[in-house]
Every structure is written in structure tokens, then in C-alpha cells.
């Protein structure tokens, strides 16, 4: 039948019979003539006789019996063969890396060997080399290629947005160096610069970079107008300012001189005959109220001169450095005296120290007395005028005290008339000096001259003890 021409050749029945005959005949063919290399799904064996085409008929697909699976496949190299093998490789390739892991794996682009036929196309034209990843089972470009760099850069861009939640370390204005700059924000087309906001690594919002011009400018116009009112601090010469507190430059010498002056003042008062006739409670009223102006007259008479230095509250770093310097002082040789610097005191001590204005009031009174060149008798009459003050609360013998004050002023006036030609001017100058005593606070004198000696003891207790003691 195969070598003869039939009138039914080309009909449907003829084709069915020929196909059935070939099905039964070709099953033994692969075992009899395995002369070519087999590719698993489309062997290289020769086609059966009479299958290339039919005489006078159209060309048909050339199917071959596979020597492994026993099925018919198109001949290798045809379009249908390439389509089938490509589809089959797509489904079967996830298991391929397990069989040929030839290099170190990088997770998304492993170093395994490329599949056969994927290096380049016929003709030498290079293609993108995709590799089957041994972890995710997908194809990725080879590490180091342009496509690989683009993909990994894009992946890092998406991952970086969630990174701020994993690494909080401080406020965004302290961590501007961690912020990631947003792309295409450098400048507009044409070279015109624009504000450079950066993605904050903590709050996830856009902020200007720290140390930039925008960062140093006020955040709003409201802050610009409010700032002067928000800090209504006193001027630098205000005595209430903590930086203008002062302390004695030589406290030991000055405090000893002031203590000696207080002792002489109490001795002068205690041994006055007109003062001794008063009851002890009335003596305490006079002394407790007048010891400060009496002391100032005594210090002026003794010409006590003192210097002060400004004090500053030390910062935490200064306290640490001072403590460390004191600990290592014994191991170091003595160094030359440094220049005078502001005295550092603790905040609890600084609030009790006198201010510059209060010390200037004390020095102003002393300078006034020294400029008048007051004599010893004038100082004694001035002390009596200050001591016998009838306006003090708690006095019971007011008439007696008032008479003592009037008598002291009369004696002072007679002395001035006898010693000075312009006695009225001299008397006015002495009264102006006494007027300055009103601006001197007794607590300031106690803190400045006596607190380092008596500690927490009050001056009222000191007056009682000195009156009862034998001076």
C-alpha cells in the first residue's frame, strides 16, 4: 500500500489508516535505530520512512517517537519544538538549581551557572544573563550587571522608608545627618535653587537639613514677634540677675575686720550711761534695729576697704572638672596664680549672696564718709543719733529715747559750730550721709560679712549674746 498510488490517497479515511499504521509500526523503531544523541523530550533519532511528506500533498508537522517517554514530538529545531521546550523549561526550572549549584548564592542573584543556551544569541549578540535563584526560585540578572544594580537600588529605596521605625535614637532636629534626601529636590530646571527638604528618619516627615539657612531661621513669623516678649528678662545691670551676684575677694580678712568693728560698736553702745539704765528688752529693741547702721559708721571710721568678685552658677561640666581638679591637685606641682575669674558657687548659695547694686550702696556710703573727713567726735554723735531712734516699734520709753536723740543732735550742732565756719553746710552734709544708710539692708551686711563666721545663727541671737556677755 505504501509503494502504490491509490485513488483514495489524500482522503480522510486514507489519512486515518496511515496514522494508525504508523502508530503500531513506530513503537519498535527507537529500539532498533538509536544512532543519535537523545535530548529527553525530542530524540535525535532518524524519522520513520515516509514521514517527511506525502507525494503531491501539503507539508505536515514532523513528529518523532521519543526514546524515553514514548510519545511523539516535533523535530528538534522547529518552531513548535522551541515553543514546547520553552514552556516545559519554565515549569521544570525551579528544581534545576538544586542539581547545579555551582557558586555562592546571594539570596536574590545566586552565583549558579547559567542555563545552556542563555549566554548569548546566535551571532554573538549579548543578552541579559538571568539566573535561577536557589532561594526564591525566580530568575534574576547576574550580580554586577546594570539590571541587577537597578533592581537592588530600587529595593533599597523601598526598604529605607520603614527603617526609621526600627532605629529611633533622638529628635529629628538632632539627627539630620541620618535623614535621607528626597530625589529630584536639589534644584528646578534652569538652575534655580530650591529648599532642600529631607526625609526624617524618626518622624517620617520632610524637614530642612540641620545647619541649613532654613533651619536657622525662625519657623514662623509668629515666633519672630513673640520672642522679645517671651523673654522679658531684666537688663544686665539688674541686681536680681544671678550672674551679677558678688562675693568677697578676701573673705577671711574682711570678715575678721567686720567682726572686730561689730565688737567695738557693741562695746560703745553697752557702756553708754544713758543706755545702761534701760531694761534689757528695750536695749534689745534698739540694738537689733540699729546694729547695721552703727556697724557702717564704725567701718567708715576704721576705713575698711574691701573688694568683691562676681559669682556665676557653675554648669554641670564645670562642677565635674572642678571636682576632678581637686582630686588630682595633690599629685601636680604648684602652678602660678591664674588671673581673677568669676567665683563659682552652688545655686543654693548664690541666691543669698548680695548683688552688685547692694554692694555699691555700701561702698557709696563709705566713700561719702571718707570724703567728708569725719572726726572721732562727729562719728560718736552720729552713732548716738542713729541708736536713739524713737520711731522703732516695741519701744515703751519713747519720750526718753526721743529726748536722748534730740540732746545728741544738739551736741553735734554745737560741735560743728565750734569747729567749722560753714556749720550749716557741714551739718547738712552729715545728715546726707546718714540718709544713705536707708539704702543699706541689714541682711546684706550679715550675708556679706558674718555668714561665713556664724553660719546659720541669726544676728538677733548674736545681739542678745553680746549684750549679756562681758565685752
From Swiss-Prot:
Q: Where is this region: 4 X 67 AA tandem repeats?
A: 1-253
Q: What keywords is this UniProt entry annotated with?
A: Cytoplasm, Nucleus, Receptor, Repeat, Repressor, Transcription, Transcription regulation
Q: Give GO MF terms, alphabetically.
A: DNA hairpin binding; nuclear receptor binding; protein domain specific binding; protein homodimerization activity; RNA binding; transcription corepressor activity
Residue ranges for motif LXXLL motif 3? 147-151
* Main localization, broad class: nucleus
Would you tell me the Gene Ontology cellular component terms? cytoplasm; membrane; nucleus; ribosome
* Intrachain S-S bonds: none
Reading the lineage from the top rank, the first entry is: Eukaryota
Q: Where in the cell is it found?
A: Nucleus; Cytoplasm
Q: Where are the sequence repeats?
A: 1-67, 68-134, 135-201, 202-253
Tell me the subunit arrangement: Homodimer. Interacts with NR5A1, NR5A2, NR0B2 and with COPS2. Interacts with ESRRB; represses ESRRB activity at the GATA6 promoter.
Domain notes per entry: Homodimerization involved an interaction between amino and carboxy termini involving LXXLL motifs and steroid binding domain (AF-2 motif). Heterodimerizes with NR5A1 and NROB2 through its N-terminal LXXLL motifs.
Question: What's the stated role of this polypeptide?
Answer: Nuclear receptor that lacks a DNA-binding domain and acts as a corepressor that inhibits the transcriptional activity of other nuclear receptors through heterodimeric interactions. Component of a cascade required for the development of the hypothalamic-pituitary-adrenal-gonadal axis. May also have a role in the development of the embryo and in the maintenance of embryonic stem cell pluripotency.
Give the family from UniProt: Belongs to the nuclear hormone receptor family. NR0 subfamily.
The protein's name is: Nuclear receptor subfamily 0 group B member 1
Give the species this sequence originates from. Sus scrofa (Pig)
Organism lineage: Eukaryota, Metazoa, Chordata, Craniata, Vertebrata
Amino acid at each position: 500500500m505504501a509503494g502504490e498510488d491509490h485513488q483514495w490517497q489524500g482522503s480522510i479515511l486514507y489519512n486515518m489508516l496511515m496514522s494508525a499504521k504508523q502508530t503500531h509500526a513506530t513503537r519498535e523503531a527507537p529500539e532498533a535505530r538509536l544512532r543519535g544523541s537523545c535530548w529527553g523530550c525530542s530524540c535525535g533519532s532518524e524519522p520513520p520512512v515516509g514521514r517527511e511528506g506525502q507525494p503531491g500533498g501539503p507539508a505536515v508537522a514532523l513528529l518523532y517517537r521519543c526514546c524515553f517517554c514514548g510519545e511523539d514530538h516535533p523535530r528538534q529545531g522547529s518552531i513548535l519544538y522551541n515553543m514546547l521546550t520553552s514552556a516545559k523549561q519554565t515549569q521544570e526550572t525551579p528544581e534545576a538549581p538544586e542539581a547545579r549549584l555551582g557558586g555562592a548564592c546571594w539570596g536574590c542573584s545566586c552565583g549558579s551557572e547559567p542555563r545552556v543556551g542563555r549566554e548569548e544569541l546566535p551571532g554573538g549578540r549579548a543578552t541579559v544573563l538571568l539566573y535561577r535563584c536557589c532561594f526564591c526560585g525566580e530568575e534574576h540578572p547576574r550580580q554586577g550587571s546594570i539590571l541587577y544594580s537597578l533592581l537592588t537600588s530600587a529595593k533599597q529605596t523601598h526598604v529605607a522608608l520603614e527603617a526609621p521605625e526600627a532605629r529611633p535614637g533622638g529628635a529629628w532636629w538632632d539627627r539630620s545627618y541620618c535623614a535621607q534626601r528626597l530625589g529630584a529636590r536639589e534644584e528646578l530646571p534652569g538652575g534655580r535653587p530650591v529648599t532642600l527638604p529631607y526625609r526624617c528618619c524618626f518622624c517620617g516627615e520632610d524637614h530642612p537639613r540641620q545647619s541649613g539657612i532654613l533651619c536657622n531661621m525662625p519657623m514662623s513669623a509668629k515666633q519672630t514677634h513673640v520672642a522679645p516678649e517671651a523673654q522679658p528678662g531684666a537688663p544686665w545691670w539688674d541686681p536680681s540677675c544671678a550672674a551679677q551676684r558678688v562675693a568677697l575677694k578676701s573673705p577671711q580678712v574682711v570678715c575678721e575686720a567686720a567682726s572686730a568693728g561689730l565688737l567695738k560698736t557693741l562695746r560703745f553702745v553697752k557702756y553708754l550711761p544713758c543706755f545702761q539704765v534701760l531694761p534689757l528688752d528695750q536695749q534689745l529693741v534698739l540694738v537689733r534695729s540699729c546694729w547695721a547702721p552703727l556697724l557702717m559708721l564704725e567701718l567708715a571710721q576704721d576705713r575698711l576697704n574691701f573688694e568683691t568678685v562676681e559669682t556665676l552658677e557653675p554648669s554641670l561640666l564645670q562642677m565635674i572638672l572642678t571636682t576632678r581638679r581637686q582630686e588630682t591637685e595633690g599629685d601636680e606641682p604648684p602652678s602660678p596664680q591664674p588671673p581673677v575669674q568669676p567665683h563659682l558657687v552652688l545655686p543654693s548659695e548664690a541666691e543669698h549672696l548680695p548683688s552688685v547694686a547692694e554692694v555699691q550702696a555700701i561702698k557709696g556710703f563709705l566713700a561719702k564718709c571718707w570724703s567728708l573727713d569725719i572726726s572721732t567726735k562727729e562719728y560718736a554723735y552720729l552713732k548716738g543719733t542713729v541708736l536713739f531712734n524713737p520711731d522703732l516699734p516695741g519701744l515703751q520709753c519713747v519720750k526718753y529715747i526721743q529726748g536722748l536723740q534730740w540732746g545728741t543732735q544738739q551736741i553735734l550742732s554745737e560741735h560743728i559750730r565750734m569747729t567749722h565756719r560753714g556749720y550749716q553746710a557741714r551739718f547738712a552734709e552729715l545728715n546726707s550721709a546718714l540718709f544713705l544708710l536707708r539704702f543699706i539692708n541689714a541682711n546684706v551686711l550679715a550675708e556679706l560679712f558674718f555668714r561665713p563666721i556664724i553660719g546659720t545663727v541669726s544676728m538677733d541671737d548674736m545681739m542678745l549674746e553680746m549684750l549679756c556677755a562681758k565685752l
